[in-house]
């Protein structure tokens, strides 16, 4: 489903929508964890939406990288992509864990929201990587004329 959405509105816009949804979910998580003393049932919905948002981001990221590079550079840019994402997965548990130990576990949602907001800013600078629509041939070209 996410791939179909991306083919209609574009990968970049799909990723940006995923980032916005992720930020809203993290803000909701912060509000819910500071408002209620136990896990509220709505948190399950919030975390399901987090999964949807993450899918919108993750499913489209590598294809954007692949679309932006020439065939001879594919391995190099795929390596950059995975190095950046794995480095974040190494660093953030250390930083977030330290913050949670020094401050409180509730700092996790604002921490996540901050970096999600920064990722939105970086996506504003992306100008390439959307799939190019294939030109229709033969009778397929006339299908849209019936609408």
Q: Where do the language-model regions lie?
A:
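C-terminal ends and interior cores of transmembrane alpha-helices
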Residues: 21-37
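Hydrophobic core of transmembrane alpha-helices in multi-pass small-molecule transporters
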Residues: 40-56
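Intracellular juxtamembrane helix-capping segments at the cytosolic ends
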Residues: 56-69
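Loop-to-transmembrane helix entry/capping segments in MFS-fold secondary transporters
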Residues: 69-81
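A membrane-interface helix-boundary motif in multi-pass transporters
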Residues: 98-116
């Amino acid at each position: 489903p996410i791939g179909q959405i991306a083919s209609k509105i574009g990968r970049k816009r799909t990723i940006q929508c995923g980032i916005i949804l992720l930020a809203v979910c993290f803000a909701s998580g912060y509000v819910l964890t500071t408002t209620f003393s136990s896990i509220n049932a709505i948190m399950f919905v919030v975390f399901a939406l987090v999964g949807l948002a993450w899918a919108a981001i993750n499913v489209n990221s590598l294809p954007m990288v692949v679309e932006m590079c020439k065939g001879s550079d594919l391995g190099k840019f795929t390596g950059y992509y995975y190095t950046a994402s794995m480095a974040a997965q190494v660093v953030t548990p250390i930083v977030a864990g330290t913050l949670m130990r020094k401050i409180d576990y509730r700092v996790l949602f604002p921490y996540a929201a901050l970096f999600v907001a920064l990722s939105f800013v970086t996506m504003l600078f992306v100008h390439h990587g959307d799939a190019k629509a294939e030109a229709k041939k033969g009778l397929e070209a006339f299908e849209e004329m019936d609408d």
